[in-house]
């Protein structure tokens, strides 16, 4: 699955964890047209944001 396949607000990780900690979980945000990337933030830190390309592989099959 890739970032562009997720809906806004869905949780994901960048590595395949079975039971990730709060620091390893991201939330998909809005698409930024000027940078052509998706803004994603950490679940545990609302001021942290990271821009990811739409074809970045993410993992959603985990227990949180």
Where are the regions that the model predicts?
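Mixed-charge, Lys/Arg-rich low-complexity intrinsically disordered regions
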Residues: 1-7
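Short, solvent-exposed secondary-structure boundary/capping segments
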Residues: 34-42
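Intrinsically disordered, low-complexity, charged/polar segments
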Residues: 44-64
């Amino acid at each position: 699955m890739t970032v562009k396949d997720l809906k806004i607000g869905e949780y994901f990780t960048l590595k395949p964890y079975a039971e990730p900690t709060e620091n390893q979980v991201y939330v998909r945000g809005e698409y930024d047209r000027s940078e052509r990337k998706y803004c994603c933030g950490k679940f545990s830190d609302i001021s942290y944001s990271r821009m990811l390309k739409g074809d970045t592989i993410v993992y959603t099959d985990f227990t949180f």
